[in-house]
């Protein structure tokens, strides 16, 4: 467990008006080699990858490969890894996709939230917990934003989660901020954006945005839930 920071209320108040780069710089100074970054290589992932590597070029970047990502995601990951010279750490579930399907079925086809949660625990949460442990992470940068889900609206920039600090430099950004940053720095967005996707995870539980969707995360998990478990 990392050394406890002083009052998180005070820290969040101090960081509230800071730019994302300044928040990352604070985190790099505070946590040093214990700081890691997670990425999904999703629609907007180039933003956090660029921000973080401008401050700390060799920061470990954790990518959880579920084995069910779209072809476009694997190609996008290769492009960004080469372009930004990422110190990429790829983690996967200890149970292969074929073995999981043989033992438990195609869990994503279920109408049960519990089955989706079981899938996410095996393919995402367990590998992430293992990655954080093996890399000796004391703090974890992510690109979540309040605009994305109801759960994320209540998040703070810095929180203590399961004995590690979760740090969210772009928590207050809106979609326009994301795309302005991508444009200003000539960064690519995920290829599926051009097909109407505003968020993308596994191929079987992501779809393009529709006119009647309440928010962008409604396009995930067939609308049964909004969080995969990594940021709960």
Curated annotation (Swiss-Prot):
Pfam family for this entry, one: PAPS_reduct
Transmembrane segments: none
GO biological process: hydrogen sulfide biosynthetic process; sulfate assimilation, phosphoadenylyl sulfate reduction by phosphoadenylyl-sulfate reductase (thioredoxin)
Enzyme class: oxidoreductase
Annotated catalysed reactions: [thioredoxin]-disulfide + sulfite + adenosine 3',5'-bisphosphate + 2 H(+) = [thioredoxin]-dithiol + 3'-phosphoadenylyl sulfate
Coiled-coil blocks: none
InterPro entries on file: PAPS/APS_Rdtase (IPR004511), PAPS_reduct_dom (IPR002500), PAPS_reductase_CysH (IPR011800), Rossmann-like_a/b/a_fold (IPR014729)
EC number: 1.8.4.8
Involved pathway(s): Sulfur metabolism; hydrogen sulfide biosynthesis; sulfite from sulfate: step 3/3
Active site, per annotation: 228 (nucleophile)
Single Gene Ontology MF annotation: phosphoadenylyl-sulfate reductase (thioredoxin) activity
Compartments, record wording: Cytoplasm
Record's keyword terms, sorted: Cytoplasm, Oxidoreductase
Top-level taxon of the source organism: Bacteria
GO cellular component: cytoplasm
HAMAP family noted in UniProt: CysH
Functional description taken from the UniProt entry: Catalyzes the formation of sulfite from phosphoadenosine 5'-phosphosulfate (PAPS) using thioredoxin as an electron donor.
Family from the record: Belongs to the PAPS reductase family. CysH subfamily.
Name of the protein this chain belongs to: Phosphoadenosine 5'-phosphosulfate reductase
């Amino acid at each position: 467990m990392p050394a406890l920071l002083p009052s998180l209320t005070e820290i969040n108040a101090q960081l509230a008006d800071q730019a994302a780069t300044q928040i990352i710089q604070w985190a790099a100074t505070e946590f040093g080699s214990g700081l890691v970054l997670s990425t999904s290589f999703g629609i907007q992932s180039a933003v956090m990858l660029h921000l973080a590597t401008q401050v700390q070029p060799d920061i470990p970047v954790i990518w959880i490969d579920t084995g069910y990502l779209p072809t476009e995601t694997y190609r996008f990951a290769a492009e960004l890894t080469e372009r930004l010279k990422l110190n990429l750490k790829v983690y996967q579930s200890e149970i292969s996709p074929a073995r999981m399907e043989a033992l438990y079925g195609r869990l994503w086809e279920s109408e049960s939230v519990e089955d989706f949660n079981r899938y996410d625990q095996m393919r995402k949460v367990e590998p992430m917990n293992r990655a954080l442990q093996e890399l000796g992470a004391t703090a974890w940068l992510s690109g979540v934003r309040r605009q994305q889900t109801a759960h994320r609206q209540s998040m703070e920039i810095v929180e203590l989660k399961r004995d590690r600090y979760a740090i969210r430099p772009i928590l207050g950004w809106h979609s326009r901020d994301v795309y302005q940053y991508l444009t200003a720095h000539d960064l690519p967005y995920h290829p599926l954006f051009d097909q109407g996707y505003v968020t993308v995870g596994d191929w079987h539980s992501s779809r393009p945005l529709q006119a009647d969707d309440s928010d962008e995360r409604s396009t995930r998990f067939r609308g049964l839930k909004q969080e995969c478990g990594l940021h709960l």
